[in-house]
């Protein structure tokens, strides 16, 4: 497939704001590939259309920011001054290169047209270049590609290198196109995506005319992590009991969600962003290897522990462990970790369609029980032990008095609150479900994404000192909810400034517009209505709790979350 043909279709997708038209244009791509390409092309096109070169679970990125791309563009014959002026005018490196493409020095008039496979494989190769002179090699590869490209191709090559296609395509839109073209119920395709986390693989398999629902590659598989099921926020235990009908209460741990995969003695541990953190937590890996059970996918919360008092250490200690690449043994001695497992998703076969009470029974056959109402003495002894692997503390009851006592106890041992789960519920990957909710004593912190940064004043004059923060809407749009600068140390500011300079899209002089990649966890005094922002709400006195490197834009809170927290707090007042 010629890359120019692909570009012409995705330009139509980019130019229409209407979702149904985007679906129709993507159907056009599927049909073109079916008649003129091969299934592997559709796999790659699906990834490229959502601004990714690799599947999300592969935990790989091209790793090239705007600054390095600009350096490469300058070697093609476009002057730095012209490029900067055009970027300031358009706010888009891709369109800027397209507009200035007449200034690119062409190698030859007799170049063969670029194919999609050629562009994709070349850009994919960029992620493998490491070591000395790696930047020079990357610049040379990008430059050679742009010199061969025609104007529209240069736009999308530049964007793909940044893994930001800006055409308004997302997973649900592609799944809808699959449903339309192949005549398969959208719900069935959505379920397959939930257990594969690989939109490209689904497209490839559909074109291969495989038995879609029976194909083993499209089932839940060990070492291919899936997105976690997410909980709703509920204002009170009373409402949770009514909502859940058949409730199980579990401690809500002050930790980080992890997914543990084990098969044939090999163990991998993934963060909630599906990042492979196995090498950072060797002591946990060894404990899991020693378990008799094999061929499993387990889900739990990883907690940094103070073993002297049995209480959790600050959340940032977990991130320090997850990020550590060197001196891991030393860090293992400094920060003790344990995992509280609360679900099992796979044991020789997928278990996510089983009700929670059955999955919990299977889990407890591996790790033992931790029934708070029956085994409190054992639990309190184990909390202060060196044991690393537990089942989550739980109590199954509709008795409000017991539930409230369990909530207070969970807070007393240093954790955030409780989870309330419907024992009859199945596991739905990647969805925020009504069959699971969380109850916390304090205001729910928000995970937000940084969309702009401003140069600071006084002691902060050398860094970006203030950050515009946003939450997501239903259509994946971003809504500004405030600006934050408090809570950040000098070390944080230095780190954020470095990242911001790597991902800035436009420099406005003292302020930069950023790719939405930095996730912050913020606390605040309250959520208030506000005419200042389009969404109608603003955070009063926001303060940064932490830089959430374990989360992506997919994990940030939504406008609906903000509305719900606002209503909960209004009722409490």
Curated annotation (Swiss-Prot):
Swiss-Prot/TrEMBL GO biological process terms: cell division; DNA biosynthetic process; DNA recombination; DNA repair; lagging strand elongation
GO molecular function: ATP binding; DNA binding; DNA ligase (ATP) activity; metal ion binding
Binding-site residues, ATP: 250, 257, 272, 301, 342, 432, 438
UniProt KW Secreted keyword: no
SUPFAM superfamilies (UniProt xref): ATP-dependent DNA ligase DNA-binding domain, DNA ligase/mRNA capping enzyme, catalytic domain, Nucleic acid-binding proteins
Cofactors demanded by this protein: Mg(2+)
PROSITE patterns reported in the protein's UniProt record: DNA_LIGASE_A1, DNA_LIGASE_A2, DNA_LIGASE_A3
Catalytic activity from the UniProt record: ATP + (deoxyribonucleotide)n-3'-hydroxyl + 5'-phospho-(deoxyribonucleotide)m = (deoxyribonucleotide)n+m + AMP + diphosphate
InterPro entries membership: ATP-dep_DNA_ligase, DNA_ligae_ATP-dep_bac/arc, DNA_ligase_ATP-dep, DNA_ligase_ATP-dep_C, DNA_ligase_ATP-dep_cent, DNA_ligase_ATP-dep_CS, DNA_ligase_ATP-dep_N, DNA_ligase_N_sf
Keywords in alphabetical order: ATP-binding, Cell cycle, Cell division, DNA damage, DNA recombination, DNA repair, DNA replication, Ligase, Magnesium, Metal-binding, Nucleotide-binding
Transmembrane regions listed in the UniProt entry: none
Enzyme Commission identifier(s): 6.5.1.1
Active site residues per record: 252
Family stated for the protein in its record: Belongs to the ATP-dependent DNA ligase family.
Function per UniProt: DNA ligase that seals nicks in double-stranded DNA during DNA replication, DNA recombination and DNA repair.
Identification of the protein by name: DNA ligase
